[in-house]
């Protein structure tokens, strides 16, 4: 236990925070992103980086926040970080350890720059997850006979995942920057179309809007700079979003808002969440599950599709995840509906690069 100079001497667990830096990337992503992997390792060894993370409110003590702030400083003109990250954006080869050392030098020399941004929250809501969510929504809607739905996205950020019916999904990159690319590991799986979405609702405590310059800069910063394709996709989808229907955006705690939204009308309602429930306290997760169970009992056409790390799902009274994880660090997709108990549907890369389908509600 150490004292945090950035938080009035509040104690923090150095080893716990160091391990968060070391393990924030999955083994698969560490192989794909050598510069970011080296940076995460260097952050774990930096006393200043530990103190900065320790100064963040508990539910946001995620190393992705520090990574995003560094990227944000680069995007907004920092004289040293800008060129460093620019090399990654352009896909130029860099020496991972040298990149990490240079970034750490800035962090330790100018910690106040990062300190001023600790109020922010990481809200990526990766658009490529829509490629997987679209498969799950289509499969469940086909099984349950739903031709029109309301879609509610919990932790919506900028709202990309409210449009699974508007995106192009491919199984390999064909040069279309706006297309989502995901590989299905399940032989013979055939996608069913996403039903007509009549109402789209995004819930988030910190809504981001595609027309606000700083919101766009911050969400760009939440992406990983070595993924040039992902950055191009974000820009292309922002442009396409101008032509999409304007969703309903509601700011606030989803636990407080969900009652109204799932009873808005009698259209079959699908609630989705992806990598957001980790930011709920244990008490909030229990309250969320109880609230959803109440509405499952009250109406016949409510569906909840959850895409989270299995350790989060364990706190939601979901069945124990099967052991057939295709790759370490995968997210588990669990489907719950008014007619069926929570059931394991499949696995996915956290950013939707691949997915597998194991089961689903059976009519």
Predicted regions and their residues:
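A short SAM/SAH-binding and catalytic strip from SAM-dependent methyltransferases
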Residues: 268-283
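Short, hydrophobic/aromatic alpha-helical segments in well-folded domains
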Residues: 132, 136-139, 218, 275-276, ...
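Phosphate/oxyanion-binding active-site loops and adjacent basic polyanion-contact surfaces
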Residues: 122-133, 227-230, 250-255, 284
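Short catalytic/ligand-binding loop motif for oxyanion handling, primarily in non-cytosolic enzymes
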Residues: 158-163, 279-281, 313-315
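A short N-terminal interaction module
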Residues: 2-112, 116-123, 127-133, 149
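Class I S-adenosyl-L-methionine-dependent methyltransferase module
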Residues: 52, 56-61, 73, 78-79, ...
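Short His-Asn-centered micro-motif
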Residues: 129, 154, 250-253, 272-274, ...
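Domain-level detector for long C-terminal conserved domains
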Residues: 213, 222-233, 247-254, 262-265, ...
């Amino acid at each position: 236990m150490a004292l945090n100079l950035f938080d009035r001497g509040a104690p923090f667990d150095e080893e716990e925070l160091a391990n968060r830096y070391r393990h924030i990337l999955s083994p698969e992503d560490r192989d794909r992103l050598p510069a970011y992997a080296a940076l995460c390792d260097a952050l774990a060894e930096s006393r200043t980086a530990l103190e900065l993370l320790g100064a963040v409110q508990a539910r946001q003590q995620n190393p992705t926040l520090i990574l995003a702030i560094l990227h944000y400083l680069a995007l907004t003109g920092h004289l040293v970080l800008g060129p460093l990250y620019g090399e990654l954006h352009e896909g130029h080869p860099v020496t991972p350890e040298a990149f990490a050392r240079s970034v750490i030098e800035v962090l330790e020399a100018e910690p106040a720059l990062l300190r001023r941004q600790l109020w922010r929250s990481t809200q990526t809501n990766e658009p490529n997850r829509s490629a997987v969510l679209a498969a799950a929504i289509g499969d469940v809607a086909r099984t349950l006979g739903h031709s029109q739905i309301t879609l509610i996205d919990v932790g919506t950020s900028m709202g990309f995942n409210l449009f699974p019916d508007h995106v192009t999904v491919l199984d390999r990159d064909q040069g279309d920057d706006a297309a989502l690319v995901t590989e299905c590991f399940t032989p013979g799986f055939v996608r069913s179309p996403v039903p007509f979405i009549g109402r789209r609702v995004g819930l988030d405590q910190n809504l981001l809007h595609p027309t606000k310059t700083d919101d766009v800069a911050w969400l760009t910063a939440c992406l990983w700079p070595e993924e040039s394709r992902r950055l191009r996709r974000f820009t292309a989808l922002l442009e396409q979003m101008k032509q999409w229907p304007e969703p309903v955006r509601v700011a606030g705690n989803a636990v407080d808002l969900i009652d109204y939204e799932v009873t808005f009308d009698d259209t079959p309602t699908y609630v989705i969440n992806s990598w957001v429930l980790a930011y709920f306290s244990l008490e909030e997760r229990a309250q969320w599950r109880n609230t959803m169970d109440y509405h499952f009992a009250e109406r016949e056409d409510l569906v909840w599709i959850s895409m989270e790390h299995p350790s989060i799902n364990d706190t939601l009274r979901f069945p124990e995840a099967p052991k057939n994880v295709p790759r370490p660090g995968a997210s588990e997709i669990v489907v719950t509906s008014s007619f069926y108990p929570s059931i394991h549907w499949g696995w996915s890369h956290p950013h939707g690069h691949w997915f597998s389908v194991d089961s689903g509600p059976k009519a």
